[in-house]
Amino acid sequence: MSRQPDLFRDGLAGGWKVLGAELGPVPEQLRCDVVIVGSGAGGGISAELLARAGFDVIVLEDGPLKTSRDFHQRESEAYPTLYQEATARKTTDKGIGILQGRCV
C-alpha cells in the first residue's frame, strides 16, 4: 500500500512558518503583504496563488494544523477536531446542519 503524500509535513520541512497553539506563541506584530482569514476552499487556493506570485502571505485559522498522520479514518475522532461545534452547528430553525471546518 502506498503512503499518501503529506503536503503540510513537506511544507514545514521546506521552511513554512507556523505560529500559535502548541507550536509556540504568536508575535505581537507580523508583517506581510496579504492576510487570508480561513484556509477553506477559497482561502487555501488564494494563499497558494498569492504566495506563488511572490506575495508574503499569512493564513489565519481557528483550529489546529493537521497532517495526514493525524487521521485514522474514525469519524468520532475527526469531527470534534475538524468541524465547528463537532458538526452540531445548525441553522436557526435547526432544519439544516452546517459543516463548517476549523483546521488547516
State where each predicted segment sits:
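N-terminal glycine-rich phosphate/pyrophosphate-binding loop and immediately adjacent elements
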Residues: 3-104
